[in-house]
Amino acid sequence: PVKALINNAGLGKMAFLEQLSVADLRLVMDVNFMSHAIITKSFLPLLKKQGSGDIVFTGSEAALKGSRQGSIYCASKFAIRGFAQALRDECGKSGVRVSILNPGAVRTPFFDELNFEPGADPENAVEADDVAAALMTVIEARPGTVLEEISISPQSHVWQRKK
């Protein structure tokens, strides 16, 4: 059996909307939303048939509040959040649990191609291990319990421009 489907693909294109190409818009929506929807559609019949399993999406703090120069990124993460909420309702009686993790800035290669990054102090970003711990809490929850949504935030939101 499949215990969990973890949807964790994502990329960021941060700019004012008019500075982004149509190809940029499609890329962000395809990676951040469509890839999750397509793989989930592929696995859902199996999970429902076995009557158990977790579907976990990596959302973002950007799924909770729009931000300047984040229009398409925020839209893609809002889409994931709405998708997870609707899917949770669709799967309610099947034994399949649906959750979303909304991390803030995570110190990962996500920022490699962006012109900003979290501040250097440890409290300016969460670590990948923090997100992994939240994920394990979700999938190890007692059967019948759904941790619908978890936000994982740095203690202090400090951003710095790259030189």
PLM feature spans:
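Active-site-adjacent segment of SDR/Rossmann-fold oxidoreductases
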Residues: 65, 86-96
